[in-house]
Amino acid sequence: MAGHSKWANIKRQKAVVDAKKGKTFTQLSRAIILAARSGIPDPSGNFQLRTAIDKAKAAGIPNDNIERAIAKGAGTFGGDNASLEEIRYEGYGPGGVAILIEALTDNRNRTAADLRVAFSKNGGNLGETGCVSWMFDQKGVCVVSGVVDEDQLLEASLEGGAESYEMTEDETAEVFTEVANLEILNQTLKDQGFKVTDAELRWIPSNNVEVTEPDQARSLLKLIDTLEGLDDVQNVTSNFEMSENLMAVSFA
């Protein structure tokens, strides 16, 4: 899980930069619309909406934009947002790396076509539903920031029903739980004084594919970056493992 967490950390750092380009603004606004539509449009009673709003605020999205997205999801703003739907696509990257794409789109044909082009131009191929999803398990993940006492984290994690946790190298920890238990774990950690900076659903690979060849690494990371740059794509997950040095060189 370590390599996956490393990639997740890089993605969070990239999100701050991407926000300046407007890409993350669109993603997070759509996530708010969907959360408000699928539950009550009140964050106090809708955990999915509450976490989507927290992410939007962390990315610097203005409150007016957040309120507008909530209103769109609730159907009180106008415009046709009912056509937005969540779709998961699956495929393979260079070297047989498994890739899951979560999209939020109002035109699934357009989205599939864009994804197919991105895969084909970067050494991969878009597959059929189910071709790689069996290699992943969906989990709830709480990201805890700041100096963390591991014994206290273990105690709080057990109390909150966590399955496991992982200390990372940048003064953060990630605590994993079943999807249905994420809200309880999030609140338990906060009640115990931990600073939870993110609570999300994440696909965790059951097995990783080790990438050691520089050309393959560059092609793979370019593919993932291209996929994440598509307007309809909300999240991209893969099962590769790569050294920090190779990742840094490939991003350069």
UniProtKB/Swiss-Prot annotation:
GO terms for molecular function: DNA binding. Pfam families: TACO1_YebC_N, Transcrip_reg. Its main location: cytoplasm. It comes from Trichormus variabilis (strain ATCC 29413 / PCC 7937). InterPro entries: Integrase-like_N, TACO1_YebC-like_2nd/3rd_dom, TACO1_YebC_N, Transcrip_reg_TACO1-like, Transcrip_reg_TACO1-like_dom3, YebC-like. Belongs to the TACO1 family. Keywords: Cytoplasm, DNA-binding, Transcription, Transcription regulation. GO terms for biological process: regulation of DNA-templated transcription. GO terms for cellular component: cytosol. This is Probable transcriptional regulatory protein Ava_1228. NCBIfam families: PRK00110.1, PRK12378.1, YebC/PmpR family DNA-binding transcriptional regulator. It is found in: Cytoplasm. The lineage of its organism: Bacteria, Bacillati, Cyanobacteriota, Cyanophyceae, Nostocales.
